[in-house]
């Protein structure tokens, strides 16, 4: 007799995160002294860990629509098999819950945990309910395959009749008897069975003498079908080491050697099954692999290897480094490519330089440097954003936040990139040409870009840096005027000049090819500026950094195309610079924002009396993060002796126009030319956007990400709570199940014994036990026992439950702690921290 339980949505009625029900006690199961107590036994089986091959289609025709294939069991389906006959132990009732465990979801941890928690809750619900209440209607026996009802966003529960007894001779002595009856749907009786797929329990049944001959024939035939399919699998696999199938055979003590009478129909099949079991038992005893009295675990591919390969035994373990190797393979290939190109270019440079021709080799070196610098910067930015997305989840789906963080990270990384490029150029020059640096005095000009500040309290420091920069520029101009004949350049200067010339030419060509509307006056301006190069290594290194910044800014603009509002307003321009410049020329400079006025101050500047008013307006308007970061990049470009006035001007106008359209509070008003000529002090401070401010900005963003990732407060899960609320409102409640679950939430239930038949990892085993503990607590179970903890992974669970009860934790509090652990573990995996705690250790330390 089969009891079918209809579609169930019980768990949607429970607000798990806010449940105030107290946690129950937990202990490990011991069979002594618990015979007279009323208790329930639940066996949870994850069908995804069972390797089931269905070969019955070729022998018995295609599978009918009414049959359920356990291989295709959906994640929303649960099969519950209940024990309705309690002859030997009337106070013990057993149930088996078949389900498929949901894969981990790093984006939505709450949905992932609730998916498994709801399945365990449904198992407890139907196990704790009376046997009669689970019957909705009756269908015929399908020999282990159950009638399937399509389900979408709900859980389908199927129940069958079974006798499940736990004996007291050992902790793992399990006898599982399947009830057989006539099949009324397929017109097929157990006395003439077709070849069916094996029971997904992988259990060798030992029926009592009360069973009829037809029942024995039915059981033996199913067992023979299992043996035949295992033999086919062993022949097919050929010991390839993949898809290992772990089977659990469960016996009762004292009945292993007994042979049951067989019918004539299944005599040959039963002999094959008996020989296979005896062969397995004898080989495992000979190798010292015998388990406890009533349970044996063996690997079928290993047995086949022993039979066919003699004494040689191959375990075929899965390589634990396969995943790490696959990840590092791509990185190593890319690193080798970069290293090879660099080595070849250096060798060519040395070879050509020995012949006295450094220029062609420098062109090769320049191309390699520019190519790989651009690729590395692009890959770093992309990888940073991907890692941030994995850590913060919902936070990084905000386009405004992503844009601000991306620009902020780029500006922060620019500081180190500038030092690296400068050091690289100097080391290459010294290694190739053996020249020493003549002076280091002008390196102070770079310090002004890093150590300055626009804080009014540090205004004196900004003025000192501004004066230092003006002095350095005056010295450079004096040197240039003092040598009008343009003396011959050294080899180091030729190296730098060619690198700069080619890089700027390439950048200009790319811009012309994509935009098509570049004014012709840009290139002559570059040539005029190029003639005024200061013949020092520091100045050339600075210009190289400027060209790198231009390329990086071009790359960022191309990547953000279509996402930035300013890009949408100017679709015809790939960079969005020249169109804004043309608009500004037509308007005559009548409107401006902070960036535009800054450029005007820079070109005309002298100190004036309206500085305090400007500073107050700056503080009140609170310029957004991305505007400040981009303004710093544009100031760097404008400081270069190679940058074009028109280009820098158009860059600042583009930023100013787009920001003024995007930010409503920014005021637009005409600028008085007399006031523009009196603002050099204020702008000298604005030019000194110090590195300390950027460092604090990046640190604040990263702290925000860490706080949200670690869920430091209980209200941080609001985004996922909305998803849970949406799931809870997707469909109507099932009235009968809601009433039944409500009745069992109010009254204390019997003690429950849980046995998990899942070959999962240690973390999954502990997480599964904790979620089952939470589900049992919600159903008012007074005492929960776990059996089958042979490896000792759950030995700390009683201590955790005692501590949680002492601290007054509820079901919702415990689930939130599990969520915090899952978030911290994902964060550790993202940063490469391998020293991770197990779940029970973490709970002991943090409860």
Curated annotation (Swiss-Prot):
Q: How is it modified after translation?
A: Phosphorylated by STK33 during sperm flagella assembly.
Q: Where is the composition biased (Basic and acidic residues)?
A: 524-533
* Pfam name, any one: RII_binding_1
Chain positions listed as propeptide in the UniProt record? 1-187
Question: Where found in the cell?
Answer: Cell projection, Cilium, Flagellum
Q: Name one GO biological process term.
A: flagellated sperm motility
Q: Which residues are annotated with the PTM Phosphoserine? A: 95, 129, 189, 203, 212, 225, 270, 301, 304, 340, 430, 441, 443, 462, 491, 496, 503, 536, 581, 626, 631, 648, 650, 674, 677, 700, 729
Protein's job: Major structural component of sperm fibrous sheath. May play a role in sperm motility.
Q: Which family does it belong to?
A: Belongs to the AKAP110 family.
The record's subunit annotation is:
Interacts with PRKAR1A and PRKAR2A. Interacts with ENO4. Interacts with QRICH2.
Name this polypeptide is given:
A-kinase anchor protein 4
Give the classification, highest ranks.
Eukaryota, Metazoa, Chordata, Craniata, Vertebrata
């Amino acid at each position: 007799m089969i009891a079918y339980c209809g579609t169930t949505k019980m768990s949607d009625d429970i607000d798990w995160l806010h449940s105030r029900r107290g946690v129950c006690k937990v202990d490990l199961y011991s069979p002594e002294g618990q015979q007279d107590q009323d208790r329930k036994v639940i066996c949870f089986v994850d069908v995804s860990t069972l390797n089931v091959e269905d070969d019955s289609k070729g022998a018995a025709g295609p599978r009918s629509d009414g049959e359920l294939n356990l291989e295709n069991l959906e994640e929303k389906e649960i099969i519950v098999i209940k024990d309705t006959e309690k002859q030997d132990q009337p106070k013990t009732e057993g149930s088996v819950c078949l389900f498929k465990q949901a894969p981990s979801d790093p984006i939505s941890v709450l949905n992932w945990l609730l998916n498994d928690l709801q399945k365990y809750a449904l198992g407890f619900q139907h196990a704790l309910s009376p046997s009669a209440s689970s019957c909705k209607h009756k269908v015929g026996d399908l020999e282990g395959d159950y009638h399937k009802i399509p389900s979408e966003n709900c859980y389908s529960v199927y129940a069958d009749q079974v006798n499940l007894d736990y004996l007291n001779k050992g902790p793992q002595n399990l006898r599982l008897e399947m009830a057989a009856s006539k099949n009324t749907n397929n017109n097929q009786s157990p006395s003439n069975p077709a070849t069916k797929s094996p029971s997904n329990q992988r259990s060798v049944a030992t029926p009592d003498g009360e069973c009829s001959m037809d029942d024995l024939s039915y059981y033996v035939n199913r067992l023979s079908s299992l043996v035949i399919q295992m033999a086919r699998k062993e022949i097919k696999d050929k010991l390839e080491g993949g898809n290992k199938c772990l089977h659990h055979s469960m016996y009762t003590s004292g009945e292993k050697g007994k042979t049951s009478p067989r019918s004539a129909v299944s005599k040959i099949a039963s002999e094959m099954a008996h020989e296979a079991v005896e062969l397995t038992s004898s080989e495992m005893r000979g190798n010292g692999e015998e388990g406890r009295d009533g349970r044996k675990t063996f690997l079928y591919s290993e047995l086949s290897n022993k039979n066919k390969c003699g004494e040689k035994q191959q375990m075929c373990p899965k390589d634990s480094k396969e995943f790490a190797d696959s990840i590092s393979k791509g990185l190593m290939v890319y690193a080798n490519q970069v290293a090879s190109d660099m080595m070849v270019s250096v060798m060519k440079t040395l070879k050509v330089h020995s012949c006295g021709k450094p220029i062609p080799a420098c062109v090769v070196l320049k191309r390699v440097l520019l190519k790989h610098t651009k690729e590395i910067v692009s890959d770093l930015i992309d990888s940073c954003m991907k890692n941030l997305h994995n850590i913060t989840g919902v936070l990084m789906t905000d386009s405004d936040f992503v844009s601000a963080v991306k620009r902020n990270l780029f500006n922060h990384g620019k500081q180190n990139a500038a030092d690296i490029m400068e050091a690289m150029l100097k080391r290459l020059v010294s290694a190739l040409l053996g020249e020493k640096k003549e002076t280091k005095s002008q390196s102070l000009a770079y310090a002004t870009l890093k150590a300055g500040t626009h804080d009014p309290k540090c205004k004196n420091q900004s003025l000192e840096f501004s004066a230092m920069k003006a002095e350095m520029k005056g010295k450079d101009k004096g040197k240039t005027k003092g040598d009008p004949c343009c003396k011959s350049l050294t080899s180091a200067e030729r190296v730098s000049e060619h690198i700069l010339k080619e890089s700027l030419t390439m950048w200009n060509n790319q811009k012309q090819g994509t935009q098509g509307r570049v004014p012709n006056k840009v290139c002559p301006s570059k040539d005029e500026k190029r003639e005024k190069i200061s013949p020092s290594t520091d100045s050339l290194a600075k210009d190289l950094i400027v060209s790198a910044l231009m390329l990086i800014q071009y790359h960022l603009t191309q990547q953000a195309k279509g996402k930035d509002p300013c890009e949408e307003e100017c679709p015809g321009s790939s960079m969005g610079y020249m169109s804004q410049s043309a608009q500004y020329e037509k308007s005559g400079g009548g409107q401006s924002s902070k960036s535009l006025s800054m450029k005007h101050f820079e070109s005309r500047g002298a100190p004036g009396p309206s500085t305090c008013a400007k500073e107050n307006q700056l503080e009140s308007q609170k310029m957004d993060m991305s505007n400040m970061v981009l303004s710093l990049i544009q100031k760097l470009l404008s400081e270069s002796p190679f940058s074009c006035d028109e280009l820098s001007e158009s860059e600042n106008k583009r930023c100013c126009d787009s920001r003024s359209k995007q930010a409503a509070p920014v005021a637009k008003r005409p600028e008085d030319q007399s006031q523009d000529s009196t603002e050099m002090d204020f702008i000298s401070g604005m030019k000194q956007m110090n590195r300390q401010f950027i460092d604090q900005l990046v640190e604040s963003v990263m702290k925000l990400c860490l706080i949200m990732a670690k869920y430091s407060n209980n209200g941080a899960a609001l985004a996922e709570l909305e998803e849970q609320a949406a799931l809870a409102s997707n469909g109507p409640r099932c009235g009968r199940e809601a009433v039944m679950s409500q009745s069992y939430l109010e009254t204390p239930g019997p003690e429950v014994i849980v046995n998990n038949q899942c070959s999962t990892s240690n973390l999954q085993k502990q997480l599964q036990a904790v979620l089952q503990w939470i589900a049992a607590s919600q159903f008012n179970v007074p005492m929960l026992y776990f059996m089958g903890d042979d490896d000792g992974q759950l030995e700390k669970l009683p201590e955790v439950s005692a501590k949680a009860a002492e601290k007054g934790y509820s079901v919702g509090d415990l689930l939130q702690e599990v969520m915090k652990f899952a978030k911290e573990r994902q964060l550790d995996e993202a940063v490469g921290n391998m020293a991770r705690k197990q779940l029970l250790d973490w709970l002991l330390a943090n409860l």
